[in-house]
Amino acid sequence: PGERGASRLLVLDRETGKRIHSHFSHLLEYLPKGTLLIANNSRVVPARMIGQRPSGGKMEFLLLTPMPLLEQHGEGDGWHCAEADGLIKPAKNARIGDHLVFGDDLRVEVLAKGEFGRHRVRLHWTGDIRALFESRGHLPLPPYIKREDTKDDRGTYQTVYARDDKAGSVAAPTAGLHFTPELRAQM
């Protein structure tokens, strides 16, 4: 994306019907006094993992269940498990009972197939599940961006008001990406 706050802003004057071409950095000039803005302060997590099917084919898994909602159960020998929802690509290659492998310390067992690539799965892991995703996961970029994520994207695709204690989003609240710290301070 471009520089925060530099995007264009189209404003419609309701009284005159006139369209005004401006920039997002001038947003406050167009908001009526007393306007309430609601901000999604969740932090996007690197919830996309690249792994393999038992046959060796490449598979992609996007965790949809927020990590704080995972009900963890011990399996012994340091392993944990939890049921979750996620997207698997390619969905047609995921079969119920498959164990997708994402390293020696993370497996995803396919429990049920849903629509549009959504699956019910059981995660099996050792160690800290958040640390696994933070270290090896990929940031889920918007689908119109046709490239792999980079380290820089972890900052670019966060709002300036995203909070670490609100980590769990698997998609950036894109409307919020235009806000700058300066604009927030003026509010």
Spans of model-derived segments:
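A cross-family signal for N-terminal binding/gating loops and helix N-caps
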Residues: 1-187
